[in-house]
Curated annotation (Swiss-Prot):
Keywords: Heme, Iron, Membrane, Metal-binding, Monooxygenase, Oxidoreductase, Stress response, Transmembrane, Transmembrane helix. CDD domains: CYP709. It comes from Arabidopsis thaliana (Mouse-ear cress). Gene3D superfamilies: Cytochrome P450. It is a single-pass membrane protein. Highly expressed in siliques and at lower levels in flowers and rosette leaves. Belongs to the cytochrome P450 family. It comes from the Eukaryota. The lineage of its organism: Eukaryota, Viridiplantae, Streptophyta, Embryophyta, Tracheophyta. This is Cytochrome P450 709B2. Its cofactor is heme. GO terms for molecular function: heme binding; iron ion binding; monooxygenase activity; oxidoreductase activity, acting on paired donors, with incorporation or reduction of molecular oxygen. The gene is CYP709B2. Heme binds at residue 518. It is an enzyme of class 1 (oxidoreductase).
């Protein structure tokens, strides 16, 4: 192929030179004739010799350029063919030998067009509020391909192979037993702008170092000190509600998902970073807009380097990212320039202490701190806001359970006592409701892991570079694991703890499991208990007739049309 390309360019170059030479010869002869009249001593053979030398030098230069061009282009063409054609064909063939099939790969796009089409159609669905079978709406492609190809199948996100596995025992191996062989999967640049390249996405030794530094911030002793801040922020939300109804004790219409997002953003900003309400809300607003941009790009085709092009969406993402970075830098600078003797013992203080460490395994750079701040600002408010939102919906639909929880709160906290860490730990029924809410409406629909080397997983041979997708929204509704009532709201399944709630001890994956399980899960549960206990002390929750049950995948599971709730004040 290389020889043919050079030969073609050589022939083309030769023909062009012949034309050039003929023109030059004619011109030279004309000049020579004129010169001959003027100077009888001219030497025609010498001119022809010079012309021949020029021609050969030019020909040699062009051929060298042609060879260099071929040497540059051919590897690129080979690499593109390998990624676009040969690798998908080879991997599909390798999995087919193991009895695993899936939708047909299409060059460049994979199955992205099919996924986009199915998701757009599913967005038009409005479900029965009493139906918890949300998978056909939020994961329509996985639902359809599972019915066609079985529990384990292969599909393509562009040129990225994705192996969908629904087996709980294999999930345990991926997330726990063999977690060192599975890193976090490749992430789109716009998502990193939103959630930061922090603990969620870093891999290898960087993850080990970050986790070791951050663990103390989420110890139970530290969490107990944060409950008063959670209470203060919740009272601030109640005050806003009171202003909206002009101080009158009457029923109130509230878009509760929006309210919970603002509340949890306030709590994470105050408890973890010691920032003011205004600064925390600025970060929250910018991340909310970034989240919309990222959700819209979930099924877009990704090209390496496209994030550097000044497209309208990229310009919007850059602008929002700069706003987030500026807000976080102001929070960090305020802590660095404070007159306090140390940086404090909250999350930000622990990270800034690490920045001044002389030990490499305990050190964090300022850039890493900024990325971790993005991570905890986003994940820290999004997880709890979603848990509170869906729990509120379920309690509004199941008034009997709402009354059971209110009675428990009155027994442990009284009707007006402020909840603290000790009373929160006694709210056992509330804990079962939260676990059931996380099972049915967990914030994350899938867990993704990338095979870092060729390996054996159960009876499967997994090639290096394969992305494993665990469809936990589907796995949480597996009747073989959770029983015949898997689609029903039944908190009592968790009455004897997580390990006995299903036929597999690690069936609940809302916070993942293993070494990379969510570092902030205890913070999220304590925060949710504090907020819900205070709400149940003061209000009855009723679902508005305007509510449309349309859970949607916006990076996390959210109600597409928010959650309109009627707050009914409790007398006395």
């Amino acid at each position: 192929m290389l020889f043919c390309s050079v030969r073609i360019l050589f022939i083309i170059s030769s023909k062009q030179l012949v034309l050039i030479s003929e023109t030059e010869v004619t011109t030279t002869l004309t000049l020579h004739t004129t010169h001959k009249i003027e100077s009888p001593t001219a030497n025609p053979p010498q001119s022809k010799k010079n012309l021949f030398v020029i021609r050969m030098e030019l020909l040699s230069t062009i051929n060298l350029l042609a060879i260099a061009l071929v040497l540059l282009v051919v590897p690129k063409i080979y690499g593109a063919c390998r990624i676009l054609v040969w690798r998908p064909w080879m991997l599909s063939r390798r999995f087919k030998k193991q009895g695993i099939s899936g939708p047909k790969y299409r060059i460049l796009y994979g199955n992205l067009r099919e996924i986009r089409k199915m998701k757009n159609e599913a967005k038009l669905m409005v479900l029965d509020p009493n139906s918890n079978d949300i998978v056909p709406r939020v994961l329509p492609h996985l639902q359809q391909w599972k019915s066609q190809y079985g529990e384990t199948f292969l599909y393509w996100q562009g040129t990225d192979p994705r192996l969908c596995i629904s087996d709980h025992e294999l999930a345990k191996q991926i997330l726990s037993n063999k977690f060192v062989f599975f890193s976090k999967s490749k992430t789109k640049p716009e998502i990193l702008k939103l959630s930061g390249n922090g603990l969620i996405f870093v891999n290898g030794l960087d993850w080990v170092r970050h986790r070791r530094i951050l663990n103390p911030a989420f110890s139970m002793d530290k969490l107990k000190l944060m409950t008063q801040l959670m209470v203060d922020c919740t009272f601030r939300m109640f005050l806003e509600w009171k202003k909206q109804r002009n101080g009158v004790e009457t029923e109130q219409f509230v878009l509760i998902s929006r309210e919970f997002k603002r509340l949890t953003a306030d709590i994470i900003a105050t408890a973890a970073f010691g920032s003011s309400y205004a600064e925390g809300i600025e970060v929250f607003k910018s991340q909310l807009e970034l989240q919309k941009c990222c959700a819209a790009a979930l099924t877009d085709l990704y090209f390496p380097g496209i994030q550097y092009l000044p497209t309208p969406s990229n310009l919007q993402i850059w602008k929002l990212d700069m706003k987030v970075n500026s807000s976080i830098k102001r929070i960090i600078d305020a802590r660095l320039t404070s007159e306090s003797k140390d940086y404090g013992n909250d999350l930000l203080g622990i990270m800034l202490t690490a920045a001044s460490s002389n030990e490499s395994e305990k050190k964090m750079s300022i850039d890493e701190i900024i990325e971790e701040c993005k991570t905890f600002f986003f994940a820290g408010h999004e997880t709890t806001a979603n848990l509170l939102t869906w729990s509120t919906m379920l309690l509004s639909l199941h008034q009997d359970w709402q009354e059971k929880l209110r009675e428990e709160v009155f027994n442990e906290c009284g009707k007006d006592k402020i909840p603290d860490a000790e009373t929160c730990s006694k709210l056992k029924l509330m804990n079962t409701v939260f676990m059931e809410s996380l099972r049915l409406y967990g914030p994350v629909l899938n867990l993704l892991r990338l095979a870092s080397e060729d390996m054996k997983l159960g009876n499967l041979e997994i090639p290096k570079g394969t992305t494993i997708i665990l469809p936990i929204a589907k796995m949480h509704r597996d009747k073989a694991v959770w029983g015949s009532d898997a689609d029903k709201f039944n908190p009592m399944r968790f009455a004897n703890g997580l390990s006995r709630a299903a036929n597999h001890p690690n069936a609940l994956l809302a916070f993942s499991m293993g070494p990379r399980a969510c570092i902030g899960q205890n913070f999220a549960i304590m925060e949710a208990k504090t907020v819900l206990a205070m709400i149940l002390q003061r209000f009855r929750l009723n679902l508005s007739a305007d509510y449309k049950h349309a859970p949607a995948d916006h990076l996390t599971l959210q109600p597409q049309y928010d959650l309109p709730v009627i707050l009914e004040p409790i007398d006395g």
